[in-house]
From Swiss-Prot:
A molecular function (GO) term: ATP binding
Designated name of the protein: Sulfate adenylyltransferase subunit 2
Organism per entry: Chlorobium phaeovibrioides (strain DSM 265 / 1930)
Family, similarity comment: Belongs to the PAPS reductase family. CysD subfamily.
Record InterPro entries: PAPS_reduct_dom (IPR002500), Rossmann-like_a/b/a_fold (IPR014729), SO4_adenylTrfase_ssu (IPR011784), Sulfate_adenylyltrnsfr_sub2 (IPR050128)
Gene name linked to the record: cysD
Upper classification of the organism: Bacteria, Pseudomonadati, Chlorobiota, Chlorobiia, Chlorobiales
Amino acid sequence: MPSYRLSHLKQLEAESIHIIREVAVEFENPVMLYSIGKDSSVMVRLAEKAFYPGKVPFPLLHVDSKWKFREMIEFRDSYARENNWGLIVHSNEEAFADGVGPFSHGSQVHTDLMKTQALLQALGKYKFDAAFGGARRDEEKSRAKERIFSFRDRFNQWDPKNQRPELWEIYNTKVHKGESIRVFPISNWTELDIWEYIRLEKIPIVPLYYAKERPVVRVEGNLIMVDDDRMPQEMRARAEMRVVRFRTLGCYPLTGAVESSASTIEEIVAEMMTTTKSERTTRVIDFDQEASMEQKKREGYF
């Protein structure tokens, strides 16, 4: 009798679907965080597969910092509309009204108020008890040591020294009143796995991932794209046209592009075969203080 073996990608897919279904069964009001990026797009496809042909039993939540690339917002709205997803968009309107932004207040204050606090507001407002996130262990060292089921106390804080064992894909989903959980179903995927799955499944993604001539300004070693006129004039005056693409997407003043000629999925996959740096090296928020990402996660960040 011939043996049946799953491919590497299909094994990862099966693990992720198992995790998504586990959360849907164990929690009363889960939500899937949707950042509009490649990892979120893969996670959404996995959720659709997990419950096909039925409807996915939880909504998408996008925490809008008001500083995302314009192409990201256009993609978000068209994708949710065309695929009939329930999409919740939440922003920290009070902080935005006060003029908080990355240019005026710096990356730390902007990220805390417009991303971390906005996320906590949304989780509290809609009383979500579990939130799926698209973080992967190969991205960054604090994420490398985080469990798939990452528990948060009643203050939404993460304690890396108080994590539960996850042996044999058996997950402890019990939480006390007021506690919640962040779940990362693609923790064991790599950036290359993500791109190969996008190619396999023909998943639509934001065009910013493809190389194209774009106006960029060099800021502390990062190529920051000029996306709107909120960028100070003195910075825009230094802009130059370069063929670049983005490996990761976030707020445009805090996300660096990389010089690349990869304009197709096949070329991106080939590029990933030889790259030696994490995509998070182009995210300013990961380096705005010592142990930056771990500290942000302790405070409630994704």
